[in-house]
Amino acid sequence: MLTHPRWTHIALPSCDLDASIAWYEEFTPHVVLDRREDDDGQSAWLSHAKQIENPFVLVLVMFWRDKGKRQPIMAPFAHIGIEMPERGDVDAIAERARAAGCLSWEPTDMPPPIGYICAITDPDGNVIEISHNQGVYAKVEEVWGGS
């Protein structure tokens, strides 16, 4: 039973849902959780596989009326952040993104609490930051204590 508010999802438009799903499965740890279709369009929910506790879902929505029209929402600096367990994970994603032509920010060490980051751009022009050793969860633990 829900006892307190929580983040659940962010929804972004997609001009080509299948291409976006393929991109997120290639360049992030996200996989399809659910797909839906109705008279207005299609949507897909993506999240980390089997993350049952505190999942966060990326909802991609392709409205039929906007099919084929890019609508970048998270750009040029606005972004979604994904933290990876290893620094090498950031480098591996950056290498694949560079080869695919979608690397926005080269991997770089930033001062604490930012950590080691790069950014990639999805098929709709949205920026996704990939990081390692970012201080977001550490700050939550420091301020509000463990779970």
Which residue stretches match the model-derived regions?
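Short glycine-enriched loop/turn motifs at secondary-structure junctions
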Residues: T3-R6, I73-F77, P111-P112
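Conserved catalytic-core motifs of GNAT/GCN5-like acyltransferases
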Residues: A11, V31-D39, D109, H132-E141
